[in-house]
Amino acid sequence: MITQTSISYYGLNYVEHAEKDFQEMKDHGVTQVILAVTEFDFDFWRPNIPKIVDKAHELGLRVLIDPWGNGKYFGGEQVSKFLQDNVENRQVSALTGEKLPYACFNTNSYRDYFKNFCVTLARECKPDGFFWDEPHYAFPKGIASITGGVADDWTCYCPVCRKRFEDYYGYPMPKYMTNDVKLFRWREALVVLSDTSKALKELDPNIEITCCVHATQNGYYVSEYRGYDNWDMVGECPYFDVFSTTIVNWALPEDFYRDITERTVAIAKKYGKKSERWLMGYYKQPKDWAQVAKWVDIAKEAGVDRLAAWTYRGGYGTVVGAPDALKLWDTIGENYKRVCKKDA
């Protein structure tokens, strides 16, 4: 049964503008707003963020904070102040040795930065929870099959990761992705999120943590290997409350969407979490608007607890807006109102 419907939102500037947008969200059946808080917002607009959270609460919306694009470790088009200020503490290519424009989340420098970012916002804003938005290693970006191929390069091969690997396994970190490297990357990738989630729950036990991972096959022949594709390891983390999988393009086969959705629910149930599936509410739109209702029904029938869409108004006015952004927004809203049984 779907009991929460979410939309992401970038407008963290003025409370009076956000208030009107929040009312529009409610009119579209939204029960929870995910505030995409950037590093720039944190440094520049922070005095207004608690007021915006308060206004959303006043209007009856739940609020999650998404550290959007933070360190370029999370999904998002935003630039990163951490990377601007740190020429080190970056992910490094295993094949070329190049430093990349992605923070290495295994370094203490980034882990401290990220934890301070989140704990500060939790103290000042009193949100209902936090949303870990597509965390990932920079590489591989292509399909990683058991035969190698386009995804042979991977991260992170920085001095911190290499030392930590050698300290744990007792031999130097290889430059190709062995089973030890895979396990090391999965395990280390969870540390920054687990530690920060634990700190947030120590601050307020009622804070809810949603971890949203890439919607990938992760089977015997094909796996993504970007750090969070081992869904069992993510699902069993004791500090996560909601297991979420990200957007699937409308142009992909319905069976693929169904498979991702059913596996999402299965992992969530296995580890006693709530399940969440995302709809593509920006950039692309279905050829047939009835597909939105069909995919929403697939999620409902599979037992999904929550639906979410990126982003408010279909990305209207941005370079990633859908061709008919407002129509997409309205269609998602119609389906939210149709299926959501709030607090059921």
Residue ranges of predicted features:
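Aromatic- and acidic-residue-enriched segments that line the glycan-binding/catalytic groove
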Residues: 72-97, 133-172, 222
